[in-house]
UniProtKB/Swiss-Prot annotation:
Family: Belongs to the class-I aminoacyl-tRNA synthetase family. Glutamate--tRNA ligase type 1 subfamily.
Cystine bridges: none
EC assignment: 6.1.1.17
Designated name of the protein: Glutamate--tRNA ligase
The organism of origin for this protein: Chlorobaculum parvum (strain DSM 263 / NCIMB 8327)
Gene name linked to the record: gltX
Keyword terms: Aminoacyl-tRNA synthetase, ATP-binding, Cytoplasm, Ligase, Nucleotide-binding, Protein biosynthesis
GO CC annotations on file: cytoplasm
Pfam families: Anticodon_2, tRNA-synt_1c
GO biological-process terms attached to the record: glutamyl-tRNA aminoacylation
Length: 503
């Protein structure tokens, strides 16, 4: 394997959504391969046909591509090592299974599910770790079952599975790239089923065969696969193959340090996409769940190119990584602040078009969906929003007439003489040919000074009639962005609609 081109893989099962842990596994495999000028592959492990979900394979790959994780080889992209779907490789597994049977490293097992459960319960009562009792281990492999009985069952067509024969009293050892040396005692290892009665291989068997034939140099996967390592290493030994290097990633934890699960929050990537998180923020966040650049670095915002340049397995920790949604939200905010205006404009158009389809705005649709207008809204609001969709939902007054006016603000700010004051100020604005924030501010201050009023007396009601709410960006800049025609119309509308609160 020395000198071989680095090849990594992400091998999900098409059983539903992409878990955030799966995204991290895919990302680390991708980053490592690209950092080493190698190849990243997607393989679909669908050997458990009972759990297969329609379109899950396509959705998994499209989610990865949305995140910027593009495979060099996959079921959709093809490649020199296909097929890349395990259910299309059954003849390959049968061939290697027969080799194990011929070499007496595997054997037929005809035990029924009832027998297996009875044996399991008996071992539990005895305080033993449940393991197969080797009832069908042949005499010539150290067992007690005559070959004649095995042949009889095969001739009768009795359903069977094929189990690996785990050697007795041996030590299975390997060097994990992240965790260092790890050793297992074969006495704790069950005779794993390799081929099921439906003719499909188990995960353990198929993954080892495929990882070897597809020439992967590094297997980067979750910590939960560590207990399977001795079975996999024994299979490599049975076939006389050199195993790849293994790196087992730390668990993802809830803030209370329990294992991340959907019982305590969202765990599917699509859940966070639906909430409005961008691919850049999600990838950045997931990259930091276990990896850090090293001592002395305070950088927390990384582009994909920067991650590829800086990533190394040596900087991945062993301890569980806490999934802190607040950190993800903070990262999203950083990307909103720095993302090019034209990119944000394109991002909010679908949200705006959906909102427009549900409402009939009084202003011209062409105007409020123009790139120039949207760019002005983005410039003014980017410091105040957390997600792209909030440019529309949080700032709807840039696109729609206020449907109501904040009651508390009306009660607090609306004086009996406010219709008269706003009407008078509206005439000054109408005569203003230079409708800029600076001029509007100067106009307002000049208007209130002779009346002995503070600017706030007009500022708050003016914001209210224009936006319907008592908060938002700089009033003067908001008025400039909305434009004179809209501002004058909304002042008149507000004067007509807002009633003087009763004492």
């Amino acid at each position: 394997m020395a000198g071989q081109r680095v090849r990594t893989r992400f091998a999900p099962s098409p059983t539903g959504y992409l878990h955030v842990g799966g995204l991290r596994t895919a990302l680390y495999n991708y980053l490592f391969a690209k950092r080493m000028n190698g190849e990243f592959v997607i393989r679909i492990e669908d050997t458990d046909q009972s759990r297969k979900v329609e379109d899950a394979e396509k959705n998994l790959i499209s989610t990865l591509e949305w995140a910027g994780i593009i495979a060099d080889e996959s079921p959709m992209h093809g490649g020199n090592y296909g097929p890349y779907v395990q259910s299309q490789r059954l003849d390959i597994y049968k061939k290697y299974c027969q080799q194990l049977l011929d070499d007496k490293n595997a054997y037929y097992c005809f035990s029924t599910s009832e027998e297996l459960e009875e044996n399991r319960q008996l071992q539990l009562k005895q305080g033993l770790q449940p393991k197969y009792n080797r009832k069908w281990l042949p005499e010539d492999m150290g067992g007690s079952m005559p070959q004649s009985e095995i042949k009889k069952k095969l001739d009768e067509g009795v359903p069977y599975v094929v189990r690996m024969k785990v050697p007795d009293y041996v030590s299975v050892w390997f060097e994990d790239v992240i965790r260092g040396p790890i050793e297992f005692d074969s006495a704790t290892i069950d005779d794993q089923v390799l081929m099921k009665s439906d003719g499909f291989p188990t995960y353990h068997f198929a993954s080892v065969i495929d990882d070897h034939l597809m020439e992967f140099t590094h297997i980067i996967r979750g910590e939960e696969w560590l207990p399977s390592m001795p079975k996999h290493l024994l299979l490599y030994e049975f076939f006389g193959w050199e195993p790849p290097k293994f790196a087992h990633l730390p668990l993802l934890l809830n803030p209370d340090r329990s294992k991340l699960s959907k019982r305590q929050g969202d765990v599917a990537v699509e859940d966070y996409v639906r909430k409005g998180y961008s691919s850049e923020a999600i990838v950045n966040f997931v990259a930091l769940l276990g990896w850090n650049e090293g001592e002395g670095s305070e950088q927390e915002v990384f582009s994909m190119d920067e991650l590829i340049e800086k990533f190394s397995l040596e900087r991945v920790g062993k301890a569980g990584a806490v999934f802190n949604v607040d950190k993800l939200s903070w990262l999203e905010k950083q990307y909103i602040k720095t993302r090019p205006v034209d990119v944000i404009v394109e991002g909010i158009k679908p949200v705006l078009n959906e909102a427009l389809a549900q409402r009939s705005p009084e202003m011209s649709v062409e105007w409020i969906t123009s790139d120039d207008y949207l760019a002005k809204v983005v410039d003014l609001m980017r410091e105040r929003v957390n997600f792209e969709h909030e440019f529309v939902t949080f700032s709807s007054y840039f696109f729609f007439e206020p449907e109501s006016y904040e009651e508390d603000a009306v009660a607090k700010r609306w004086r009996p003489d406010m219709p008269e004051l706003l009407g008078e100020f509206s005439k000054l604005l109408e005569a203003n040919d230079d409708f800029t924030a600076e001029n509007i501010e100067a106009e307002l201050k000049a208007f209130v000074a002779p009346k002995g009023l503070k600017p706030a007396v007009i500022i708050h009601p003016l914001r209210l009639v224009v936006s319907g709410v008592s908060f938002g960006p700089s009033l003067y800049h908001m008025l400039e962005v909305l434009g004179k025609e809209t501002v004058l119309r909304r002042i008149a509308r507000g004067i007509e609609r807002i009633s003087i609160p009763e004492a």
